[in-house]
């Protein structure tokens, strides 16, 4: 790519938290593995396993749903998850339902449609107890789901403006290159869900993400909803 003059090493300059510059020579390590920051394990958004799931908070009497990609888990179909979630709502009668789309880059928006249809006529929608979290990593079909939840279920959007535009290309597919095995993703459809609108989906309540919160394992968005 022409970024470095040699493939053996590169000198990088970093700015630390004290606003001082630090230079370091980095060398490639084919065995290196990325590790999550220890504080990230404290965040509820990263605690659940799989693409989607629910966590019931007994103390707060709320259900937290994480939805990390708009795709089916072959071992755990979304229809099964939807049925289990609706059962939990019926049995627990939570005060709030939170659907986290902050780290969802898209896929197939129609997967969530049956859940949205089921929530539309429920008390969580009518009493404005449904919260949808959006942010800079909310793209494509996840953005469409957020808009549907807002329009059909009167969901309250919390977080940051989406990186993806309201009107955009989506329904992502992918294929693998034969020699490099690199995965290429591409969009197959254009969605104009808000005619004439230009730009991101803006939350009803904006709460900026910060490095300091991440380092402390703190989720200011969830803390705000807990206080409501």
Segments predicted by a language model, with ranges:
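Flexible, low-complexity junctional segments that flank or bridge functional domains
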Residues: 1-96
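Conserved acidic, small-residue-rich alpha-beta core segments centered on
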Residues: 91, 96-98, 102-227
């Amino acid at each position: 790519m022409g970024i470095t003059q040699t493939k053996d090493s590169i000198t990088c300059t970093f700015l630390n938290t004290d606003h001082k510059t630090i230079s370091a020579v980095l060398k490639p390590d084919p065995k290196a593995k990325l590790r999550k920051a220890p504080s990230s394990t404290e965040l509820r958004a990263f605690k659940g396993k799989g693409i989607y799931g629910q966590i019931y908070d007994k103390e707060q009497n709320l259900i937290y749903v994480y939805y990390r990609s708009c795709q089916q888990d072959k071992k755990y179909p979304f229809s099964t998850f939807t049925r289990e979630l609706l059962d939990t709502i019926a049995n627990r009668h939570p005060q709030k339902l939170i659907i986290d789309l902050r780290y969802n880059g898209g896929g197939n928006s129609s997967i969530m449609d049956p859940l949205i249809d089921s929530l539309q006529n429920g008390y969580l929608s009518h009493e404005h107890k449904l919260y949808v979290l959006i942010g800079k990593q909310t793209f494509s079909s996840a953005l469409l789901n957020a808009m549907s939840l807002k329009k059909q279920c009167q969901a309250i959007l919390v977080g940051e403006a989406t990186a993806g535009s309201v009107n955009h290309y989506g329904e992502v597919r992918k294929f693998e290159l034969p020699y490099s095995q690199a995965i290429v993703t591409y969009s197959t459809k254009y969605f104009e869900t808000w005619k004439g609108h230009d730009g991101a989906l803006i939350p009803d309540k904006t709460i900026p993400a910060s490095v300091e919160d991440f380092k402390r394992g703190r989720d200011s968005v969830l803390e705000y909803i807990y206080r409501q």
